[in-house]
């Protein structure tokens, strides 16, 4: 009775527990020969459960690639080069995908190639065996060229004029400059020429000092003279002020004479 109910060839009936979900990734149960389809098989669940790859969506880059190849602004980079690189990349990617899908032998690793695993993967720009692997380098070179041209087009502030490279002027090394600077020194201290220069320098210094002293003395003498004259002028002003005050007092003390004509009359 129990053997008939739980046989492997007949479906299980009357079980009080719910049916377990099918194990999609158990290799032991999928590859066993001589077993029929179970009730929880992938074929039966396909109509009720959503597909495994419904959420995944493939992105078609052909429109972007064609638009990039047709852009006329990239004058520095050749458009045919972009088109050839993109087409060769697509062809290589398609051939690799067919080879992996058909289950053929993988390409043996050679010089400049990388051995691919049994799992399928999308073509990467960094793969050394892809013919389109030179595209990022070409794009980087073009971008650097555009940036350098844009920087050269911008006005730069004027700098100090530099001598032209083709000028016949001698280019002196630092050692030569030092030697020349060392050669410009004066004569030795014990030589008569050095003594003569030193005497001339001392005489010039003495003359300048004496001239400054004379100017200082002259200024001091002028200052003394002007101070004395100023003092004399102050004394003169004080004397005149005192005389004026005495005259006023004298005229105030005099009596008015009766024979004087009235004010405003012409006396002759």
Curated annotation (Swiss-Prot):
BP-aspect Gene Ontology terms: DNA-templated transcription; fat cell differentiation; hematopoietic progenitor cell differentiation; inner ear development; negative regulation of DNA-templated transcription; positive regulation of osteoblast differentiation; positive regulation of transcription by RNA polymerase II; regulation of transcription by RNA polymerase II
Entries under CDD domains matching the protein: bZIP_CEBPD
Positions with biased composition (Basic and acidic residues): 177-201
Biased segments, Pro residues type: 155-167
Compartment(s): Nucleus
Residue ranges of the region described as Leucine-zipper: 226-254
Cross-link Glycyl lysine isopeptide (Lys-Gly) (interchain with G-Cter in SUMO) placement: 120
Oligomer and partners: Binds DNA as a homodimer and as a heterodimer. Can form stable heterodimers with CEBPA, CEBPB and CEBPE. Directly interacts with SPI1/PU.1; this interaction does not affect DNA-binding properties of each partner. Interacts with PRDM16.
Protein name according to UniProt: CCAAT/enhancer-binding protein delta
